[in-house]
């Protein structure tokens, strides 16, 4: 894993519920490799059981080489009846822990189609950050991913 640094590569962490502590140890052991946690670390949104996930996310976010993709939240909720309000506690927590500088919006497409349509997920994510500044929203929905993955910008400044 540490050889990724030599090639300027990063690593996306696709975990199962309960594996955030293992990822945290990997991130700790590879301080010069950037890691993107997918699906906000797979909290139990459906049952509104966010502990110990909250503490695990805070511990992971303490490492500056750890980033978090705000994806998969709808698929972690009740597929039939989720509302944006159901997702907000988990989404707010990752933004609180990682900040906008290290949190990137992700679609989780096509998997998210099992829980919702793409426009509904985008609306829920936008709703979750409705009180944030334009600069913070731009960071979340564009800049963090551009910077992390080395993509060409698609938004004008």
Regions from the PLM with identified roles:
Residues 1-104, 152-157:
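Catalytic pocket-lining loop regions of alpha/beta-barrel enzymes
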Residues 92-93, 97-104, 113-157:
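Mid-to-C-terminal alpha-helical segments outside catalytic/metal-binding sites
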Residues 75-76, 111-113:
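Short, active-site-adjacent cap segments at secondary-structure transitions
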Residues 108:
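Active-site glycine-centered loops adjacent to acidic/histidine catalytic or metal-binding residues
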Residues 9, 43, 80, 111, ...:
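Residues at structural and domain junctions
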């Amino acid at each position: 894993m540490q050889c990724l640094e030599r090639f300027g590569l990063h690593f996306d962490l696709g975990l199962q519920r309960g594996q955030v502590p293992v990822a945290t140890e990997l991130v700790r052991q590879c301080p010069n490799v950037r890691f993107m946690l997918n699906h906000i670390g797979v909290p139990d949104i459906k049952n509104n059981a966010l502990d110990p996930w909250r503490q695990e996310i805070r511990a992971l976010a303490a490492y500056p080489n750890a980033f978090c993709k705000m994806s998969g939240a709808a698929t972690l909720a009740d597929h039939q009846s989720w509302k944006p309000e159901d997702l907000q506690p988990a989404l707010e927590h990752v933004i609180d822990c990682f900040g906008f500088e290290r949190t990137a919006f992700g679609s989780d497409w096509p998997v998210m189609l099992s829980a919702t349509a793409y426009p509904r997920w985008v609306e829920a994510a936008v709703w979750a950050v409705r009180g944030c500044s334009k600069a913070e929203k731009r960071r979340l929905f564009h800049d963090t991913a551009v910077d992390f993955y080395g993509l060409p910008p698609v938004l004008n400044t």
